[in-house]
Structures are given as C-alpha cells and as structure tokens.
Amino acid sequence: MLFEHLQYYGVSRKIIEAMNKVDRKLFVPSELQESAYLDIPLPIGYGQTISAPHMVGMMCEYLELKDGDRVLEIGTGSGYNAAVMSLLVGESGWIYTIERIPELVQEAQKRINLLGINNITIIVGDGKEGLEEYAPFDKITVTCYAKHIPKKLIEQLKDNGIMVIPVGNEYVQILKLIRKSGEKIIEEDLTHVRFVPMQ
C-alpha cells in the first residue's frame, strides 16, 4: 500500500484506503510522474500545487467525513483531494469544488471523468464567495490560505458543521478547525501549514 506511513500522522485506515484507490500519478504533470508517490507537494502549473499526501489525509481526518456529507471544497487544483473525498462521502454524498483557474477546472474534470466518479461538481468561481446556491454544507475544506476566515463560508456551513481552513500570511499559516454551533463559532488551531494564497 502506498500511503501506509500516514497512520503516523493519525490518519485512519478508511482514509488511507481511499487515498490508495485514487492514483496520485493521474493528478500530477507528466514530467513529475516519478515523484507522484512521494510525500511532498508538487507544482501543477498556474502557480498552484497538489498537497502532500499526509496533508490530504490529515485534512480529511479533521473533517470527520461520513456517508451522505455534502462538502464544499475551495481550491480544486488537480482534483485529487475532491476525488479522495468523493469516496469518503459515498454515493449518497456530494463534493462541490470551486477553482478560479479555468484551465485547472478543465484538467480536473477530465481526470474525474476518466475515473468514473459521478458525485463531484466542479465550478469556476471565487472561493471567498462559496456556493450559495448549493448551501448549506456539512463540511467545508479550504486548500489555500486566507488572511481572515471568509464570512460567507461560515454562513454557508450547516449548524454542527465543520470547516478546515489555513489562516495567516505568506510567512505564517495555521490550519484551523471551525465548528458552528447555532450562533456560536468555535475555533481550534491544529498545526502550522504552508499553502498557496486565496485570490
């Protein structure tokens, strides 16, 4: 199994199995195929990256994904993270993912089609705005850092929902876990991370 070492990051067997089912090699540029299974982020063009496998696993773990979850992802990138999450929410769940770069959306859509995954919707748009027409969401995951948590994302999170988002600047970023309980927003700092900026 490719990602067995992720158990040392606290990633569960269920998530490791989902990650092993989605071939990361399909999601990286041809010139980086030899590095596809290394536990490092890789450039995918347009100033964007595919996250290191341990970060994908940890973020899925923090989200507590379950069958039937409706998930909003900000930053489709290569589509790898959405593909993994699509397995974790099952056929009754759905992944809505937003990407601002049309070329990345086209490439991600091709990969998703190739894999025969049919519970993902990829949309070109501004992540800060979320997707009001499909809200509310059980879970929201953000794969780019924000200087502040966008208010619209909190508004689109279901009561008792979970959001995982990197917050900070180009030098220091903290991965935060946000829980929404009625009018109350509970923030927890998880770990230091390094992501590309939300535009």
UniProtKB/Swiss-Prot annotation:
Gene: pcm
Record-annotated disulphide pairs: none
Family, per entry: Belongs to the methyltransferase superfamily. L-isoaspartyl/D-aspartyl protein methyltransferase family.
GO function terms (MF aspect): protein-L-isoaspartate (D-aspartate) O-methyltransferase activity
Compartment(s) of residence: Cytoplasm
Catalytic residues, chain numbering: 51
Keywords: Cytoplasm, Methyltransferase, S-adenosyl-L-methionine, Transferase
Reactions listed under catalytic activity: [protein]-L-isoaspartate + S-adenosyl-L-methionine = [protein]-L-isoaspartate alpha-methyl ester + S-adenosyl-L-homocysteine
Main location: cytoplasm
GO BP of this protein: methylation; protein modification process; protein repair
Assigned GO CC terms: cytoplasm
Described purpose of this protein according to its UniProt entry: Catalyzes the methyl esterification of L-isoaspartyl residues in peptides and proteins that result from spontaneous decomposition of normal L-aspartyl and L-asparaginyl residues. It plays a role in the repair and/or degradation of damaged proteins.
The protein's enzyme class: transferase
EC number: 2.1.1.77
Entry protein name: Protein-L-isoaspartate O-methyltransferase
Species per Swiss-Prot/TrEMBL record: Fervidobacterium nodosum (strain ATCC 35602 / DSM 5306 / Rt17-B1)
Highest taxon, organism lineage: Bacteria
